[in-house]
Design a protein with these regions (language model features):
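Short aromatic-glycine-(Arg/Gly/Cys) micro-motifs in beta-strand/loop hairpins
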Residues: 20-39
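A short, charged, amphipathic alpha-helix used as a generic interaction element across diverse proteins
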Residues: 45-64
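Short, surface-exposed beta-strand/loop "edge" segments at domain boundaries and coil↔beta transitions
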Residues: 37-42, 76
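Generic structural motif
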Residues: 17-25, 68-72
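N-proximal, solvent-exposed amphipathic alpha-helical segments enriched in charged/polar residues
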Residues: 1-19
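A short amphipathic beta-strand at an alpha->beta junction
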Residues: 59-76
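Generic short N-terminal amphipathic or hydrophobic helices
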Residues: 12-13, 23, 31, 74
Length: 76
């Protein structure tokens, strides 16, 4: 399901410093997975920038026809 156009759209969005997500290709949809441990240690303004990045990446993928789920791994 993850096409070359989706890859280009996803990589055109620049992530904030020291923040990355995992993009998982499920057969019928894509998942953007946040690392909650990294996210929890971020300053407030950095969290806002990170979430804006995730929303922009989600929107870019959806513009290329993807169904996108955003999730995180819970801290235990």
């Amino acid at each position: 399901m993850y096409t070359d156009q989706m890859r280009r759209a996803f990589h055109s969005i620049i992530p904030p410093n020291n923040f990355q997500v995992e993009l998982i290709d499920n057969e019928h949809f894509l998942t953007i997975k946040l690392d909650e441990y990294v996210f929890a240690r971020m300053a407030h303004d950095d969290k806002i920038q990170a979430l804006q990045y995730v929303l922009n990446a989600k929107k870019a993928l959806e513009m290329e026809g993807a169904i996108v789920l955003v999730t995180r791994e819970a801290i235990k």
